Amino acid sequence: MESGVRILSLLILLHNSLASESEESRLIKHLFTSYDQKARPSKGLDDVVPVTLKLTLTNLIDLNEKEETLTTNVWVQIAWNDDRLVWNVTDYGGIGFVPVPHDIMWLPDIVLENNIDGNFEVAYYANVLVYNTGYIYWLPPAIFRSTCNIEITYFPFDWQNCSLVFRSKTYSANEIDLQLVTDDETGLPFDQVDIDREAFTENGEWAIMHRPARKILNPKYSKEDLRYQEIVFNLIIQRKPLFYIINIIVPCVLISFLVVLVYFLPAKAGGQKCTVSISVLLAQTVFLFLIAQMVPETSLSVPLIGKYLMFVMFVSTLIVLSCVIVLNVSLRSPSTHNLSTKVKHMLLEVLPQFLHLRVEPCDEGEETPRERRRSSLGIMLKAEEYVLKKPRSELMFERQRERHGMRREPDGYRADGFDVGVTTTLYRNLAQCAPEIKDCVDACNFITQNTKEQNRTGSEMENWILIGKVLDVLCFWVALPLFVLGTLAIFLMGHFNTAPEHPF
C-alpha cells in the first residue's frame, strides 16, 4: 500500500514538472517566434529606449600605480523595457518571468570604454530575465581592468580618483537614453556605486572614501555621436600608508639621521666622516631607486617620498662638503696658513660662547702641558752642563765633611761648594779660555730657541684643531634643525593630504 502511494506521488511530481517545463518552453516559443533581436524595442524610429545602469562592487582587487591600471570585480546591472516581450501570466501557468539566453535577445551593447586590455565586454554572459510586463533585467559579472590616472605628488600619502566609463558602442543618444537606476526608497537616481556587503572584500592597501556615479553629456559632440552620453562611476580611494611607513619611510629617516652623527667624530678623522656620509648617500640612492620602481614614469610631478630623499641627499652632500672643509682647517700649520688675531678671537672666543662650548685656546706666552713636557729638555741640559763643569773628584766627595760631622761652609758659599763671586769669575775665565765651552753654550741657546719655536708652532696647530672642533659643533647645530624641520615639513604635507569631503 505504501509503495503504491509513493509511486503515485512521484508520478504527480513528474507530471507537474513536465507541465511547468512545457509551459515555459511554450512561453519562450511564443515570445521569440517572430522576435527580431537586431531591432530596437521601440514602437517608432524616433522613439528612444531608456536603459538604466547600476554598478555593484564586490572586490577592489588592485591598483597598479606603475601601469596606472585599476582592477575591480563588479556586477553590471542593465535594465530596459521591451514591449514585444509581454504576456498574460494566467495563460502560462502563472509564470511571471523567464530566463533566456543572451544571444537571442536584443542588447544595448553597453561596454566599458576606458578598459586597458581591449576587452570591452563582460567576463560572463549570464541569462537575461524577462518579466511578463516587458521589463528586461540583465546582471552579468565582470572583472574590469580600467585606466586610472595616478597622481603621485603625495605618494605614499595620496588618494586617487579612478573612474569606470560606460557607453553604448552601437547606439547613439537618439536611439537609447542611458540613465542611472532609480532608488526604490527615495525615487531618485541611485547616484553611487553599490557595494555588496556580504561579498565585498576589503582591500589591504586602499580604503574607499567616495563612490559617486553620474551621467555626463558631452556638449562638444552631437547626439548622433556615440561619445555624447556616458555613465561614469567614480571610485575615490585613499591609500593606507602603514606598509610604506614601516618598510620605507622609517628606515630611510633612520639611515638619513646617521649622516648628522658624523660631527661627533674627531675633527681630524675627516676620512671616516666622508666615508660614513657617502655610505648614507648611497643608501638614499637605493631608496630612491626603489621608489622609482613603484610609481609611473612621469615628469608631471615628483612623489613626496622622492622629494624627501632628494632633500636628505642634498643635506648629506652639504655635510660631506663641511667635513672636507673642517678637515682642511684642522690640518693647517703655521708654515701654510697664518692664524690671525681676529679669526682666533671670533672662532675660539666669541663662537664657543654662542654655542655654549668650553674651549681654551693656546697662547704663545702661556706654557701649555706640551710645553711643560718640552721644557724638561732644558732642565736636563742644565744638569749636564753642571756635571760637565764640576770635576769628578768634587762630585764624589761633595759634602763629605758634613757627613763626618765637620763644619759646614760659610753662608757665602752655594750649596754646590762654590762661592758666588768665585763662580762668576770662574765662568768668565772659562768662557775666555775655552772656546769649546762657548760653543756648548751657544748650542744650548739654539736648542732653547728651537724649543720655543716648536712650542709656538704646536700651540698654533692645536688652535687650528680647536677651530675644527668648533666648526664641527656649529655644523651639527645647523644640520640637525635643518634635517628635523625638513623631515617634519615634507611629511606633514602628506599627512594633511586627505580625500575631499565631497566628491564633486
UniProtKB/Swiss-Prot annotation:
One Gene Ontology term from the biological process aspect of the record: chemical synaptic transmission
Segments in the Extracellular topological domain: 20-240, 293-307, 498-504
Disulfide bonds: C148-C162
Pfam families, sorted: Neur_chan_LBD, Neur_chan_memb
Reaction(s) catalysed by this chain's protein: K(+)(in) = K(+)(out); Na(+)(in) = Na(+)(out)
Organism domain of life: Eukaryota
Annotated TM spans: 241-265, 274-292, 308-329, 474-497
Leader sequence residues: 1-19
Keyword Nucleotidyltransferase: no
A single Gene Ontology CC term: postsynaptic membrane
Keyword Isomerase: no
Gene Ontology MF: a single term: acetylcholine-gated monoatomic cation-selective channel activity
Membrane topology according to the record: Multi-pass membrane protein
Residue positions with a glycan: N88, N161
InterPro entries found in the cross-reference section: Neur_chan_lig-bd, Neur_chan_lig-bd_sf, Neur_channel, Neuro-gated_channel_TM_sf, Neuro_actylchol_rec, Neurotrans-gated_channel_TM, Neurotransmitter_ion_chnl_CS, Nicotinic_acetylcholine_rcpt
Function: After binding acetylcholine, the AChR responds by an extensive change in conformation that affects all subunits and leads to opening of an ion-conducting channel across the plasma membrane.
Protein's name in the database: Acetylcholine receptor subunit epsilon
The species this protein was found in: Xenopus laevis
